[in-house]
Structures are given as structure tokens and as C-alpha cells.
Amino acid sequence: MNAVPIILVFAAGLNSCIGNILLKWGRASLPPSAGLADTFLTPGFVGGVVFYGINVLLFAKALDSLEVSVAYPILAGSGFAMLIIASHYFFGEPFHLHKWIGVALVLVGIIFLARGG
């Protein structure tokens, strides 16, 4: 099997993770009283949308040669695993044993999907 589509899916997952981090950062930079419309003007929101767009483009290209039933779980799982780690690093969100186990199980599932697809 060609590794390029799988790499594209992981790159899409990374862009999804970055987009989520930027959205959280953009919203966190506003006062609690800020409305939803204020969010649209933050660099974090704009950056998040850009990275989501890149995510969609990379994923669409990967779908040229991967089954969506294989590609999407890899995208979602890899993005989830990266986001758990990034949110701990950037925002100090807790990363307890249960999250480690969850990330490990997701990664094992991704390996099974990637090899079986």
C-alpha cells in the first residue's frame, strides 16, 4: 500500500489539532463577557479556520486512494491523540492515566485500520 495517503491523513489530523488549539487560544484571549461575534475577529479564530481548510484539502486528496471508512477514523483518532497532548502542553489541561490509556488505545486502533485498509 502507498504510504502517501496515510501521511496526508495524519497531516490533516495535525492541521485539525492546530486549528482547535488556535480556536481555544483565540477564545481564551477574550474577556469572559465577550460575545460570540467577537470571536470571529480574533487571530486565533482566523488561524483556526485556515488550518481547518488545509485539513479538508489534505483529507480530500487522501480520499482519492483510501476508503473513507478507513481514512476518517485515522483522521479523527490521530487528531484526537495530538490534541490531548497539545492541550496539556499549551493550556495545562490535565493528562491523567485514563487519558494516556485512551490515547494508547486510539493509536492501536489507528495502526489496525492503517494496516487493514
From Swiss-Prot:
Q: How does it sit in the membrane?
A: Multi-pass membrane protein
Source organism superkingdom: Bacteria
Q: Which GO terms describe its molecular function?
A: transmembrane transporter activity
Q: Where are the transmembrane segments?
A: 3-23, 40-60, 66-86, 94-114
Q: What is a single cellular component term in the Gene Ontology annotation?
A: plasma membrane
Keywords associated with the record? Cell membrane, Membrane, Plasmid, Transmembrane, Transmembrane helix
Localization of this protein:
Cell membrane
- Signal peptide segment: none
Disulfide bond sites: none
Q: Give the primary localization class.
A: membrane
The family classification in the record reads: To E.coli and S.aureus ethidium bromide resistance proteins (ebr/QacC/EmrE/MvrC).
Q: What is this protein called?
A: Uncharacterized protein y4nH
User: Which organism is this entry from?
Assistant: Sinorhizobium fredii (strain NBRC 101917 / NGR234)
